[in-house]
Amino acid sequence: TCAELVGNHSLGIEERGSANILVADGNVPLGESTCISCGNCVQVCPTGALIDRRSMYQGRETDLTHTNSICMDCSVGCYRVVKTRDNRLVRIDGDMDATFADGLLCEMGRYNPVKENRVRVNEPLIRREGKLQPISWDDALNVVSTQLKAHDSTEIKAYISGRQSIENLSTFQNFFKDNYKVGQTALFGHDESAAVSIELAREFGAFESDLGALEEADAAVILGADLVDDYPVAGFMLKRKPGELFNMVLVTKEENKLADNFSNRLVSVGENYEQIINLLACHKTAGSCEETDQIIAEEGLAARRAYRLLESVQTWQHPVIIVGKDFAKLENLETLKKLIRYSQEVGAKVIIMKGDTNSFAASLLGLEVNPEMGESPVAFYAIGDGHACHHAVDGMKNGGFKIVQTSYMDEFAELADVILPSKIWAEEEGHYLTTDGRIELNRQALIPGVQQRSVSEVLAGLAEKSGFSLQSDWQAVVTDKISSIVLA
């Protein structure tokens, strides 16, 4: 599993015959090895030599409730089985019967939810005389409704986490944009990749491939994407390729561990995306060109290495181009168009990795990306079980009245004037749109506390107090929009 499926090569066999033993990196303690804690070896181990200590002694497999669901810790959309007992999260396993990703999970999807140790918000809170105090749901909604009505709607801002379901994103947009006409409805964070893919679709239509292209590829050009840290299971699909046969062109902002797996590689640390695209374009047919020579002169030894490697482009049978958040920016749109035209000329498949779990759906619904977190008299923050974004926290410090719907007490909650308790991922059902266009269902696995509510439930309550009803048909909105990939 470690080598053949994950491509990490941490585990191996030492000694022979009856003395052979499973070891990590030449027999060092597992915690000191190159193990990435994905847990896939633990799940498939047939003997029990490797076990999950967090779920030990919490019951037999038949004592647990199994809920087939989807991972929402990135936009890849791996399938997983959430295992619970007595309304407690016991363990998360990969769905070995799934057709995508061989049932693999990474540390984020398997262990991070189980390790969650933040303090839950269990009741609505309001800040009075500098201190947070309990308040009833009805009173909390009255306070929020009064604040929204007391100000010019165009000055109000509303932000939401990309971890929210499509249902919650759609209701959020319907409430704040369609009904309240607020000045800004946006996702947290700086990632523009989903919005970029939609802009490119206006000219090129459904130009993207699904993640299955990674399995078929014999060469990859990766521009501004970190598959190891941000999308580990997608990284597994490349890491397990034979390093001496697979061709890798890797252009990143910072050092990238994926390069260590391949000998036939060009690694450029920096944002030389346009130069690399020009090199590729020059080599779509055999031979050289003046532009290539000019780039080589400008870039020096690294570019000469690129020149030698890119001469092999003609031998690539199934190349894939992977674009990430460091390159997929609206300011790079024209360069990206040049890349798409090149890919169509040479038959290369293109995948744009799309930020947070549901940022693709959010962009299709019309939510803004990379917002300016400036001052506003009232701001609504639908965070859910997401983590505090420093950019957003800094923006909150300059704001007016702050309404925060969150599952946990964190930096957002410390700045809030009203805190509304939110359900976590396992406590509500909802749909998610993956980076390659699959609409998947996250099934409820836990029963929430009596005070926890979803974003949609909170906004429905506010709509009732404001005298209007919410009408949100997310299926029609998402599927009718021009998309960079055919939605499934």
Regions found by a protein language model. Give the residues of each.
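Non-catalytic alpha/beta scaffold blocks inside enzyme catalytic domains
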Residues: G189-L487
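N-terminal export/assembly segments and adjacent metallocofactor-ligating motifs
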Residues: T1-Q294, E464, F468
